[in-house]
């Protein structure tokens, strides 16, 4: 151990021994010469102090040496670690009888040995492995998490390989990694491909169809829809009856309709009815069979289905109906709903800048005709320009049932108001007292007065004067352009007014004056919306059919009286469709 110490430490040790010997000598002299005791004790104290100082210095030096030794060891380990050759990675392809492994690394397929610390039985196809400088497996890693996204075209017969479509429609055969071997894969799924090894690792939840459809049925039923009693009865006869009474249809040799077209002006409940159909159908089937029922509502967003690349829109349509067939094959009723159907399936040859409808329409026709062999699929389309949809789609045998969703009349408006004005709302005490404290009668009275205000053919309700091609003129009132969406908006306006009144004057509750003022504000807000540049197109979308309209003049009552009408030649604000 002395050989490991520095010369300074040895000198200090010798000095300590020398001082200890001197102390012993002084003690002996003190015993021999008591008279010199005082001076000797003083020297003894000095010597002991020197001894303690040297001992402390020796301990500090020893601690410094220990720290230096630990730093040297740590630096040596760091140097050894940095000097190690780099480790490579490879993809596990298989295990051989002699426990060697087939690995794909560096663009080559190699057969390598494995370290005893690697559990060979736990290795899975496609797993990433760490290799040392001798290309031997030293550690098992996780699966690859990045790569290219490809679309599955079909699974091969062996169940371990698949045909996929990569970029630029390139077809490629790939291997399925272990995580995918037990998963249910179907054509159109997006998969993660590691292009060098040729393995697909996981299913990417990014199906193009899933971006365009809503599979789960919204929680909407017919009781939430007001003013459409006849239309609801028609669609129930067209959709629910064939599923609930299949035996009767077979007995009468009657085929269920393949599709339903809901058409009419905007904001009148076409989409709402379509959403309620699947929900009602699932409940009816559950009541009949006693089994928890479930139906699917594929809500196709028409404009988003369009794609600038040739053939992509048609492929999306095929995937939509493929999804519908899969769900229907499980015995579940499936409704494929095309909202704004005229945006996708226009009359062929009517395109201004493109002829995309020449291929989209035939694709839908072939899919609808293909639905004939399925029992649980029905197509529902909604449009406010049914005149622009290709006639081949509207013919019997495809969209068999056509239901017009009219603008609400006074009776329908009362029913719609009752969906939004309920007794649970905070009502003003003065209004309730007018009806003897009966909240139900108060609400009914509010609805009655509001409907009378909206549907009265008074000068204050005049909206437009239209001129037809034959020279006839007609005055249109706001009631002619009323809709369920407008009624909901009026109620919402009144509720906001009630909130502001409570914040300003501390008067809580909805009043009939709020509803009447909301009607005025709603009418005033819509006064600039009629498109006077193309009056006939505007009239068709607004639900005004018949003789062609060539001129529109607004008849809105302004603050100082009737504002001047606007002709199609001088109009500068084309506005939006009402």
UniProtKB/Swiss-Prot annotation:
Q: Which cysteines are joined by disulfide bonds?
A: none
Q: Which GO terms describe its biological process?
A: modification-dependent protein catabolic process; proteasomal protein catabolic process
Question: Which residue ranges does the record annotate as region Docks into pockets in the proteasome alpha-ring?
Answer: 577-578
Q: Which GO terms describe its molecular function?
A: ATP binding; ATP hydrolysis activity
Pathway, per record: Protein degradation; proteasomal Pup-dependent pathway
Q: Which GO terms describe its cellular component?
A: proteasome complex
Superkingdom assignment: Bacteria
Q: Which residues form a coiled coil?
A: 8-84
- A Pfam family cross-referenced in the UniProt record is Prot_ATP_ID_OB_N
Query: What SMART domains does this protein map onto?
Result: AAA
Q: Which residues bind ATP?
A: 267-272
The alphabetized UniProt keywords are: ATP-binding, Chaperone, Coiled coil, Nucleotide-binding, Proteasome
Which PROSITE patterns does this chain map to? AAA
Q: What does this protein do?
A: ATPase which is responsible for recognizing, binding, unfolding and translocation of pupylated proteins into the bacterial 20S proteasome core particle. May be essential for opening the gate of the 20S proteasome via an interaction with its C-terminus, thereby allowing substrate entry and access to the site of proteolysis. Thus, the C-termini of the proteasomal ATPase may function like a 'key in a lock' to induce gate opening and therefore regulate proteolysis.
UniProt free text on domains = Consists of three main regions, an N-terminal coiled-coil domain that binds to protein Pup and functions as a docking station, an interdomain involved in ARC hexamerization, and a C-terminal ATPase domain of the AAA type.
Self-association and partners: Homohexamer. Assembles into a hexameric ring structure that caps the 20S proteasome core. Strongly interacts with the prokaryotic ubiquitin-like protein Pup through a hydrophobic interface; the interacting region of ARC lies in its N-terminal coiled-coil domain. There is one Pup binding site per ARC hexamer ring. Upon ATP-binding, the C-terminus of ARC interacts with the alpha-rings of the proteasome core, possibly by binding to the intersubunit pockets.
Entry's family note: Belongs to the AAA ATPase family.
Q: What is this protein called?
A: Proteasome-associated ATPase
Task: Give me the gene this protein comes from.
Answer: arc
């Amino acid at each position: 151990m002395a050989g490991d110490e520095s010369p300074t430490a040895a000198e200090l040790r010798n000095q300590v021994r020398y001082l200890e010997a001197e102390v012993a000598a002084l003690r002996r002299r003190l015993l021999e010469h008591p008279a010199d005791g005082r001076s000797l004790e003083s020297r003894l104290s000095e010597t002991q102090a020197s001894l303690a100082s040297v001992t402390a210095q020796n301990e500090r030096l020893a601690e410094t040496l220990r720290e230096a030794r630990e730093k040297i060891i740590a630096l040596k380990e760091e140097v050894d670690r940095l000097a190690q050759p780099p480790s490579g990675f490879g993809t596990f392809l298989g295990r051989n009888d002699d426990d060697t492994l087939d690995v794909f690394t560096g663009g080559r397929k190699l057969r390598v040995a494995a370290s005893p610390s690697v559990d060979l039985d736990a290795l899975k196809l496609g797993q990433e492995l760490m290799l040392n400088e001798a290309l031997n497996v030293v550690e098992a890693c996780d699966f690859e998490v990045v790569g290219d996204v490809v679309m599955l075209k079909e699974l091969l017969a062996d169940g371990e390989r698949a045909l996929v479509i990569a970029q630029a429609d390139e077809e490629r055969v790939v291997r399925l990694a272990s995580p995918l071997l037990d998963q249910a894969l179907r054509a159109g799924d997006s998969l993660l491909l590691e292009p060098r090894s040729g393995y697909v690792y996981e299913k990417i939840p990014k199906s193009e169809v899933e971006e365009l459809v809503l599979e789960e049925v919204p929680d909407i039923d017919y009781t939430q829809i007001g003013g459409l009693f006849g239309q609801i009865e028609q669609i129930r006869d067209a959709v629910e009856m064939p599923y609930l009474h299949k035996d009767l249809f077979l007995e009468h040799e009657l085929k269920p309709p393949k599709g339903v077209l809901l058409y009419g002006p905007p904001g009148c409940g076409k989409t709402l009815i379509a959403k309620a159909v699947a929900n009602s159908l699932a409940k009816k089937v559950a009541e009949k069979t006693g089994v928890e029922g479930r139906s699917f509502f594929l809500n196709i967003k028409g404009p988003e289905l369009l794609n600038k690349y040739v053939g992509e829109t048609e492929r999306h349509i095929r995937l939509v109906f493929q999804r519908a067939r899969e769900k229907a094959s499980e015995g579940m009723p499936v409704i494929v709903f095309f909202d704004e159907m005229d945006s996708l399936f226009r009359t062929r040859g009517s395109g201004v800048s493109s002829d995309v409808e020449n291929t989209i329409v035939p694709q839908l026709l072939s899919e609808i005709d293909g639905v004939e062999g399925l029992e649980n699929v029905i197509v529902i389309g909604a449009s406010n320009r049914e005149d622009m949809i290709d006639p081949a789609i509207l013919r019997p045998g495809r969209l068999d049932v056509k239901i017009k969703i009219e603008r609400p009349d006074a009776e329908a408006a009362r029913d719609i108001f009752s969906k939004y004005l309920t007794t649970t709302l905070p009502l003003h005490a003065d209004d309730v007292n007018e009806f003897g404290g009966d909240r139900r009668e108060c609400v009914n009275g509010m609805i009655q007065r509001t409907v009378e205000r909206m549907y009265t053919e008074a000068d204050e309700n005049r909206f437009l004067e239209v001129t037809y091609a034959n020279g006839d003129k007609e005055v249109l009132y706001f009631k002619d352009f009323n809709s369920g969406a407008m009624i909901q908006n009026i109620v919402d306006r009144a509720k906001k007014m009630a909130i502001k009144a409570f914040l300003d004057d501390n008067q809580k509750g909805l009043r009939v004056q709020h509803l009447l003022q909301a009607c005025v504000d709603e009418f005033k807000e819509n006064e600039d919306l009629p498109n006077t540049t193309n009056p006939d197109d505007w009239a068709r979308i607004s639900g005004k059919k018949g003789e062609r309209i060539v001129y529109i003049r607004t008849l809105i009552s302004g603050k100082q009286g009737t504002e001047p009408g606007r002709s199609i030649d001088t109009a500068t604000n084309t506005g939006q469709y009402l």
